[in-house]
């Protein structure tokens, strides 16, 4: 909640929660769960940062500058934890690593800018797609 919604849940977020929870009721839930497990495994065991330079298509990166999400943070030492999830730095590094990429930083937005501030998210997305 801290990095996703600025520690404040709003009723307009309910539909996104219901969407995610609804997958568990679908007949294809085992497939969805398996894909989620594979994605989680990739995040933990196969860093893709080294492959960013291989991306050939124009790429838009939209980040919230308040985001400090860091998977595995609780397993790291305190000094390493302080260096994790610094998206205001990671966004710039990622943009430099991906050829033909554009970075949009949304101030005071957390991990889910498309939910937390849809209007600020959708404008640069549409502009990018229309190029």
Residue ranges and their predicted role:
Residues 25-96:
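Conserved serine/cysteine hydrolase catalytic core
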Residues 12-19, 30-31, 93:
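Exposed alpha-helical structural elements
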Residues 8, 59, 102-103:
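Secondary-structure boundary/capping signal
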Residues 5-6, 25, 99, 130:
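Residues at helix-coil transition
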Residues 1-10, 19-24, 36-43:
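Helix-loop "lid/cap" segments that line or gate small-molecule binding pockets
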Residues 7-14, 131:
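Surface-exposed helix-capping loop/turn segments at secondary-structure junctions
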Residues 88-131:
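Catalytic active-site module of serine/aspartate enzymes centered on a nucleophile-bearing elbow/loop
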């Amino acid at each position: 909640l801290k990095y996703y919604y600025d520690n404040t849940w709003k009723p307009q977020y309910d539909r996104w929660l219901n969407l995610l929870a609804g997958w568990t009721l679908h007949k294809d839930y085992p497939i969805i769960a398996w894909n989620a497990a594979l994605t989680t495994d990739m995040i933990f065991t196969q860093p893709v940062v080294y492959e960013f330079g291989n991306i050939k298509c124009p790429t838009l990166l939209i980040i919230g500058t308040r985001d400090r999400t860091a998977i595995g943070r609780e397993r790291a030492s305190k000094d390493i934890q302080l260096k994790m999830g610094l998206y205001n730095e990671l966004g710039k590094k990622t943009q430099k690593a991906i050829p033909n990429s554009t970075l949009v930083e949304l101030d005071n937005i957390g991990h889910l800018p498309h939910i937390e501030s849809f209007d600020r998210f959708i404008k640069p997305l549409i502009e990018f797609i229309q190029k």
